[in-house]
Regions:
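...the same signal can extend to comparable exposed beta-sheet modules
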Residues: 1-2, 27, 314-317, 337, ...
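Bacterial N-terminal signal peptides that target proteins for export
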Residues: 2-12
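Bacterial N-terminal signal peptides
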Residues: 12-22
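Long, helix-rich interaction regions
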Residues: 22-23, 383
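N-terminal Sec/ER secretory leader and immediately downstream segment
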Residues: 28-253, 319, 334, 351-383
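Intrinsically disordered, low-complexity segments enriched in Gly and acidic/Ser/Thr residues
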Residues: 254-352
Length: 383
């Protein structure tokens, strides 16, 4: 009976969110589908792939073959916590990440399947239903992610429409933010930036990256392209000399994705990409949207940590508690300066590298001159 009610509730929630997403998509002529069809198809694939990552980890966690890997991962996470790292290696934690992971062929097989998913074509309805259909997510989590994705699609459509001015785009973004906040407040992440501790130092932090480096690399690469392609679109409108750079971001993305098993000469991000680091133009032109998208990306990664954490009891309850922390306007709030510092502290290179400029190695703890850094970044504080 409980399962039936849950299925009905998720179906109803999914239907209402599908209507919301469709209304956003239909409101923008000359949007992403018209101007950048390859990106639009990839964004559909990203939703299906992300839900697939969650479900794949949940399935591996239940597989008896993974028992040794789960024990090793739990010991590793416990050891890090005892070393007073707050349950997380902090920014730059990718330096200690075992690229072979803890689940061997199980993760490799999942990565191969998900690599095919991200390369496939997926309808709007498949994308809209992806989170609702995920068995690893709760009703609340799937609803928040789906409503968040509808907002992101609105943002991408607005900026992709080259028939409107920057000012008109900013006004349209303001309306999209209001719609996002008011359409179903229970399913909206906070409009205020969240503290780094909420993402980096929660009890289950690092389980995703340490346990599943191939899957985390894929998720972070997908998040990187969403921000990097948006940076290329916006900066081409702000300064025409940088126009036509979307194909470059696509090339860099596919280099990060690499082979079916995730092997590549161009490393995937080891840190979650953030808007100020990868798309400074988004923060300059639409700081509120930047914060919402970063909160959503943080939530997506934190959910992956909870799902990846081995042998966790009451996982559904933990997921809903986590979601509530991101939707709350009272808990774990950061001021603007801390938000920017936290976004940049992990390093642009570790977050996947710049959208347009060149950065061949980590810039952390080194000066721009020492790096010979050529990174196109035009970011100003919001008015």
């Amino acid at each position: 009976m409980t399962t039936t009610i849950k299925m009905i509730t998720k179906f109803t929630l999914g239907a209402s969110l599908s209507i919301l997403i469709s209304s956003y998509a239909n409101s923008q002529s000359g949007g992403l589908v018209d101007e950048y069809p390859e990106l639009a198809n990839l964004y559909n694939a990203f939703d299906v792939t992300q839900a697939g990552i969650y479900d794949a980890m949940a399935a591996i966690g239940l597989d008896p073959v993974s028992q040794d890997g789960r024990m090793e991962l739990k010991m590793h996470l416990d050891m890090m916590a005892e070393m007073d790292h707050g349950g997380h290696g902090g920014h730059g934690g990718g330096m200690v990440m075992n690229m072979d992971g803890h689940f061997g062929q199980l993760e490799t097989d999942a990565r191969i399947e998900l690599g095919e998913t991200v390369r496939g074509r997926h309808s709007d309805s498949q994308s809209q239903d992806a989170f609702t259909n995920s068995s690893a997510l709760t009703e609340l989590a799937s609803g928040v992610l789906a409503q968040g994705r509808s907002f992101e699609r609105a943002v991408w459509d607005i900026f992709a429409d080259d028939s409107t001015s920057i000012y008109q785009k900013q006004m349209a973004i303001d309306e999209a933010v209001k719609d996002y906040q008011s359409s179903n407040p229970r399913l909206a992440v906070s409009l205020s930036p969240k503290t780094a501790d909420l993402y980096l130092d929660h009890i289950y932090a690092d389980a995703f990256r340490m346990g599943y480096p191939k899957l985390s690399g894929l998720l972070y690469s997908n998040q990187w392209l969403q921000l990097a392609s948006l940076e290329a679109i916006i900066i081409g409108q702000v300064d025409p000399q940088f126009g036509g750079q979307v194909p470059l971001t696509l090339e860099r993305y596919w280099n990060k994705v690499g082979s079916d098993t995730g092997m590549t000469m161009f490393p995937a991000p080891t840190e979650m990409p953030s808007a100020p680091a990868i798309s400074p133009q988004l923060y300059s032109q639409a700081p509120q949207a930047s914060i919402i998208i970063d909160n959503l990306n943080m939530l997506e990664s934190a959910l992956a940590d909870v799902i990846a954490y081995p042998n966790l009891q009451n996982r559904a309850s933990v997921i809903d508690q986590l979601v509530a922390q991101y939707t709350s306007d009272d808990m774990y709030l950061a001021d603007t300066m801390d938000y920017l510092l936290n976004a940049l502290r992990g390093g642009i290179f570790n977050q996947g590298g710049p959208a347009i400029g060149d950065l061949s190695r980590s810039e952390r703890n080194r000066s721009r001159d020492a790096m010979s850094m050529n990174h196109t970044m035009i970011m100003s504080s919001p008015n």
